[in-house]
């Protein structure tokens, strides 16, 4: 039995893949703050046996009540990274295993790291539960590739570069590959990479170069900080340098600069027509 929290773009993909494996996932529930989104996902999948529910993922008590009612063996968290800790806490209180695709970050600071979630490690171990963090593509598959290479192809890994290239074209002037708020927060904060036992900080998108990708060709690639670096240098101590690169088109970056210049990338509250809004969330 699996409970999926989140019915956005990533949650929709996860629900479809889970539903394609009924031999593994015999019972499925999708839960979100907006139940109608969950119902729309179920309709798109075409499996009326999938259950849906409304839940506030910021509320531990609501989560615990839902978990105790449905009794899943695992919760797949594809909600927002701000909600990782409340969902992990609810899993501990309900005795449920946990999996997510992105590490925790606080709402009021554009900064993410694993320390907040790693602090739960002993509690999950003591409860006999498993928590798998960062199990998307990057982080996730990128870590699996690294582990496979270390096990089967190299005596040790000293230099690691993870490259993320999107060669698709949606013919839109500006669109993000996942939640726009999280995506823009990620790429507008300082870059970081690991070298000789230290973390080196760079300005946002300061370091870039052309990288040539198989079957795609050269693409402008920008150094970012990505959470799997923190985990990989810890688990593969032979690494001397670890970096993460992502491709962006110039049109995308131009729109991003405009968003920043007009203040719409701000994550603090401002007053608009007598209401308190966060510009990036409003966008």
What name fits each language-model region?
Residues 10-11:
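Hydrophobic/small residue at the entry helix of a nucleotide-binding pocket
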Residues 27-29:
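Short beta-strand element of Class I
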Residues 102-129:
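Rossmann-fold NAD(P)-binding glycine/threonine-rich loop
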Residues 34-36:
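Helix N-cap at the beta1-alpha1 junction of Rossmann-like dinucleotide-binding domains, i.e.
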């Amino acid at each position: 039995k699996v409970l999926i929290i989140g019915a956005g773009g990533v949650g929709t993909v996860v629900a479809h893949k889970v539903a394609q494996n009924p031999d593994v996932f015999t019972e499925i529930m999708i839960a979100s703050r907006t139940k109608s989104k969950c119902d729309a996902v179920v309709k798109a999948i075409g499996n009326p046996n999938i259950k849906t529910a409304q839940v506030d993922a910021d509320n531990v008590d609501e989560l615990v009540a839902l978990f105790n009612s449905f009794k899943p063996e695992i919760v797949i968290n594809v909600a927002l990274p701000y909600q990782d800790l409340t969902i992990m806490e609810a899993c501990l209180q309900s005795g449920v295993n946990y999996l997510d695709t992105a590490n925790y970050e606080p709402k009021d600071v554009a900064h993410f790291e694993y320390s907040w979630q790693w602090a739960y490690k002993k509690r999950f171990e003591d409860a006999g539960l498993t928590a798998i963090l960062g199990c998307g593509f990057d982080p996730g598959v990128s870590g699996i590739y690294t582990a496979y290479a270390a096990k089967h192809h190299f005596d040790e890994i000293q230099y690691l570069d993870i490259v993320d290239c999107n060669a698709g074209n949606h013919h839109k002037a500006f669109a993000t590959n996942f939640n726009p708020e999280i995506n823009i927060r990620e790429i507008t904060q300082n870059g970081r990479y690991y070298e000789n036992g230290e973390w080196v900080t760079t300005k946002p998108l300061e370091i870039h170069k052309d990288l040539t990708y198989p079957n795609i060709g050269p693409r402008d690639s920008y150094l970012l900080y990505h959470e799997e670096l923190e985990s990989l240098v810890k688990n593969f101590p032979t690494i001397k340098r670890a970096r993460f690169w992502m491709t962006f088109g110039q049109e995308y970056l131009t729109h991003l600069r405009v968003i920043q210049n007009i203040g719409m990338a701000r994550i603090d509250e401002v007053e608009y027509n007598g209401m308190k809004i966060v510009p990036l969330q409003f966008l």
